[in-house]
Design a protein with these regions (language model features):
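Hydrophobic ligand-binding cavity/cleft-lining segments
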Residues: 1-40
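Short coil-to-beta transition motif at edge beta-strands of beta-rich domains
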Residues: 40-47
């Protein structure tokens, strides 16, 4: 089943810096505190574990100055490339930080995946105080 790219944006309060949030998006320790139960890395391959489900991804790009990171999912059954990308942007006027997530889902699973992102972002907000 073909997956379509979509983005969701979450506004985080301005009481913290992009650098503080960035460590939760770009390190195995940070990712395992909100995104997955456990995250390990071997060179550029990340292993994400959620209870009994394991998924691997290759680190495709990381920009510590633009606060952008992309992981390409290593899925044998997929005919095309899918990835998850995290972008942090700061609004010059409000000073709010936005987390923009790019992901892929089939039409039938998109709503469930957005609900999952909403839940995960609430965890991220709790641990970062945003």
């Amino acid at each position: 089943m073909r997956k379509e790219k979509f983005t969701v944006e979450y506004i985080l309060r301005s009481n913290t810096s992009q650098v503080q949030i960035w460590k939760y998006l770009s390190s195995p320790e940070g990712l395992s505190s909100w995104f997955a139960d456990d995250v390990t890395v071997d060179k550029n391959t990340y292993r994400f574990c959620w209870k009994e489900h394991v998924q691997e991804a290759k680190l495709i790009s990381i920009d510590d100055y633009k606060f952008c990171i992309r992981f390409q999912w290593l899925e044998e059954e997929e005919e095309y490339v899918t990835y998850v990308q995290f972008d942090l942007k700061k609004d010059d006027i409000t000073q709010d930080i936005s987390l923009i997530i790019t992901d892929f889902a089939s039409e039938t699973e998109k709503e469930d995946l957005i609900d999952l992102w909403n839940t995960q972002i609430e965890v991220l907000r709790r641990i970062t105080g945003t």
